A protein has these predicted regions:
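Class I SAM-dependent methyltransferase SAM/SAH-binding core
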Residues: 39-91
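A short SAM/SAH-binding and catalytic strip from SAM-dependent methyltransferases
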Residues: 101-113
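C-terminal lobe and adjacent flexible extensions of AdoMet/dcAdoMet transferase-like proteins
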Residues: 191-198
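Conserved class I S-adenosyl-L-methionine
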Residues: 1-37, 49-50, 72, 76, ...
């Protein structure tokens, strides 16, 4: 089953499963957006669960792979300068350095090529811009035999559970890590802030 098909089927129940455990985590991550008005890419906007936590001083583009997710996000855009775009995170339909910042909440461990997704985010963010990430990651060298064993099945349906963030970041020399916090499930879910080199 393709990623687009999986998330089209999941759209009606996505909020029920994901909203509550990630509410404060999303808000805390988005509070790290700067005070000055900026242009921000919300990559993998899904049903729009980030929208209630977005500071209204910025202008946003929300991108998602599926029309079903964007349809659910649209009503949440009221009161926010937000345009919704259907597209893939692996080939963003935006020019280089188009955004001041990017938000990647629960997207890097979903796409089939996490390094490609982060590379695209780095491409469209201006130098000195930030990339805010919340997702499930293994730590480098972490054994996690059950997660690794389940990954072939789970990744075909909804998400990868074997992504090692340090390996993904190592492929992006133009991004530097400035903050990495364990936020849920004994550190499996992490909140990360990167800055693009000048």
């Amino acid at each position: 089953m393709s990623l687009e098909s999986s998330y089209t089927l999941l759209a009606p129940m996505y909020d029920f499963v994901i909203e509550r455990p990630f509410r404060k985590i999303r808000a805390d991550s988005l509070s790290r957006l700067p005070a000055e008005p900026s242009t921000v890419l919300v990559n993998g906007i899904g049903t729009g669960l980030d929208l209630p936590h977005l500071p209204t001083r910025h202008r946003y583009i929300g991108l998602d792979l599926t029309a079903a997710m964007l349809k659910r996000a649209r009503p949440r855009t009221r009161g926010i300068a937000m345009n919704l775009v259907q597209g893939t995170s692996l080939a963003l339909p935006f020019a280089d350095d188009a955004f001041d910042h990017a938000v990647l909440h629960l997207i890097l461990a979903i796409v089939p090529d996490p390094a490609g997704c982060l590379r695209e985010a780095a491409r469209v963010v201006k130098p000195k811009g930030s990339v805010l990430i919340v997702d499930k990651f293994l730590r480098k060298g972490q054994w996690a035999p059950l997660r690794r064993a389940l990954n072939p099945l789970v990744s075909r349906l909804v998400t990868r559970v074997d992504v090692v963030f340090e390996q993904v970041l190592a492929k992006q020399p133009n991004l530097r890590l400035v903050d990495d916090r364990p936020v849920l499930f004994n550190g499996w879910i992490r909140s990360i802030r990167l800055i693009k080199n000048a």
